[in-house]
């Protein structure tokens, strides 16, 4: 008999939506393009780009996601474009306007999405005492593409400061998002500092950082600095699609067919799902909103994609929308799990425990199964396969459950 932790919880391929560049009310990209044009001499279109993304739009987006089961990650940039800290108040808006947005985010966005900072400003590197740009000016996404590895404490404190601002407004982050190229040339070091930076604020044993994209081939979720004794690790989240919802400019390409075609067979997502690879969509908030409140080009494209994916798997037998932290926590649990088979008994040592832990068992026919003395219910269809059940398909049996203890025993009857 062979036993392994299944690659995906409930053996359903995860789908997740990454939203980058979002924050409290302001469109930070207006200021990024304005300021970056001065720095590099390029002529990005910026003057007619909206300065504000209304709370009403964000609320409508969140309600749609909750209604249709969409899950993922939503950035809240802590000090957007160095305009001010959101825990101290942005000078552009009243305290009441900002508190209203934050309350909406805590009630609606958090229900469907992880919250992460996208480092502190997504533009200038700031001094941690003043939160003003350092001189000479450095850019988070350009000058810190290679993080200053010789200043480990500074980088750790910088990431921790981003997390602390969010925690101060009741939005404890599950991990961090990289602004542009941030950390891309020093990924191992980046992973090293993310762990203590996030844990020092939230206590999360398995935070993640979003860095990188898989254009083709396998979609990995690397696990860094795993410590089985402490039950800690850092996961690296990677996207697996391009951004065809308006992109980072807010006026880029919009094409739902590039995700999934109307006949449900073409596009990037079906290719991923059919190969058992996570479909992790990367989009930008300014693209969802577009150029004005009646535009919503990216949001309209998302609605089409969500509808087509539901048509493709109407009973949710093969796929499941997930928060990014659900994907990364499961990857940590799977990577660190120890599985020992002794006859009809499976001994599990689980430094990281996650909901819906799923085992794949081959080489024997299972009549009954129990976890910690509690029987699992036998089901005969994928639609009914859930935590607390087991399902036999062909030569394999899947068993899913909620492990209550690090050392868990699964008893089988053949």
What is each residue range found by the language model?
Residues 272, 283-287, 292-336:
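Catalytic cores of secreted or luminal carbohydrate-active enzymes
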Residues 1-9, 16, 22, 28, ...:
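Active-site-adjacent pocket scaffolds in enzyme catalytic domains
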Residues 14-16, 26-27, 34-142, 174-177, ...:
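Short, well-structured secondary-structure segments
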Residues 44-49, 88, 145-151, 248-257, ...:
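Surface-exposed cleft-lining segments at the edges of enzyme active sites
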Residues 21-24, 77-83, 120-124, 180-185, ...:
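Short, solvent-exposed loop/turn segments at secondary-structure junctions
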Residues 324, 334-414:
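C-terminal beta-sandwich/jelly-roll accessory domains of carbohydrate-active enzymes
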Residues 1-14, 352, 405, 413-414:
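Mature N-terminal, pre-catalytic/accessory segment of carbohydrate-active enzymes
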Residues 44-61, 91-103, 152-161, 188-196, ...:
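Well-ordered, non-membrane alpha-helical segments in soluble/globular domains
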């Amino acid at each position: 008999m062979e036993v392994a932790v299944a690659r995906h919880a409930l053996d359903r391929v995860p789908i997740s939506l990454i939203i980058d560049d979002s924050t409290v009310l302001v469109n930070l990209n207006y200021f990024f393009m304005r300021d970056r044009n001065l720095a590099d001499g390029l002529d990005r279109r910026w003057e007619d780009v909206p300065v504000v993304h209304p709370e009403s739009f964000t609320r409508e987006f969140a309600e749609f996601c909750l209604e249709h089961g969409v899950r993922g990650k939503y950035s809240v940039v802590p000090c957007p474009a160095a305009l001010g800290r959101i825990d101290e108040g942005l000078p552009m808006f009243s305290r009441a306007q900002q508190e209203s947005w934050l309350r909406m985010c805590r009630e609606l966005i958090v229900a469907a999405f992880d919250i992460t900072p996208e480092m502190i400003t997504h533009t200038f590197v700031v001094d941690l005492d003043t939160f003003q740009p350092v001189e000479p000016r450095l850019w988070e996404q350009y000058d810190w593409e290679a993080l200053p590895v010789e200043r480990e404490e500074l980088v750790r404190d910088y990431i921790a400061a981003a997390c602390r601002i969010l925690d101060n407004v009741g939005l404890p982050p599950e991990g961090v998002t990289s602004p542009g190229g941030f950390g891309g040339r020093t990924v191992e070091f980046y992973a090293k500092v993310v762990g203590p930076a996030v844990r020092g604020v939230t206590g999360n044993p398995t935070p993640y950082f979003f860095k990188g994209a898989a254009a083709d081939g396998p979609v990995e979720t690397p696990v860094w600095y795993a410590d089985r004794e402490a039950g800690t690790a850092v996961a690296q989240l990677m996207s697996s699609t391009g951004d065809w919802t308006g992109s980072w400019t807010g006026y880029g390409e919009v094409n739902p067919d590039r995700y999934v075609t109307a006949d449900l067979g073409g596009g990037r997502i079906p290719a991923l799902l059919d190969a058992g690879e996570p479909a992790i969509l990367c989009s930008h908030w300014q693209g969802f909103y577009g150029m004005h409140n009646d535009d919503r080009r990216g949001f309209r494209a998302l609605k089409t994609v969500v509808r087509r994916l539901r048509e493709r798997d109407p009973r949710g037998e093969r796929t499941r929308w997930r928060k990014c932290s659900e994907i990364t926590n499961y990857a940590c649990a799977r990577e660190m799990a120890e599985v020992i088979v002794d006859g009809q008994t499976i001994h599990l040592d689980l430094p990281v425990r996650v909901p819906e832990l799923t085992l794949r068992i081959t080489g024997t026919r299972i009549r009954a199964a129990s976890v910690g003395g509690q029987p699992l219910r036998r089901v005969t269809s994928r639609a009914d396969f859930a935590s607390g059940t087991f399902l036999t398909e062909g030569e394999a049996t899947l068993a899913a459950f909620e492990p209550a203890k690090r050392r868990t025993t699964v008893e089988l009857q053949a």
